[in-house]
């Protein structure tokens, strides 16, 4: 049995150098795939980032700090999240971005584990560039190339983007 998890995060923003800096995760979305079949099992959590959300980030995903105050903190859900992804192959579009945020959150909790200690990671941006050179490889364009409907995607959302990524990955790698 091969277990994969399409994963996406939404964040409060990013530093000028593209690293998390003092930014935090505000949403995690995961979609389980077993033996190339989307199982219907998923994980979605909204998180209180304990800090304001950059205006540019809000334009991308639509979330404000007021909407997320009172939601669980990352530490509150971390063990359930780790249990969900442990031992799987994570499919992440631009994996360096998401894993850097997850690793930062683990570190803030005092955990020494990195994402790659918990699961293997496949960067679907790199995979798309390898399999389909010359194409734009953002998620919307890949949806168009592979006939995955994304008409309901007005803004980014971690679970929605993970669902789209799961479908794109399966189409991109042979259906």
Question: What are the language-model segments listed below?
Answer:
Residues 1-119, 129, 137-155:
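Conserved non-catalytic scaffold segment of RNase H-like nuclease domains
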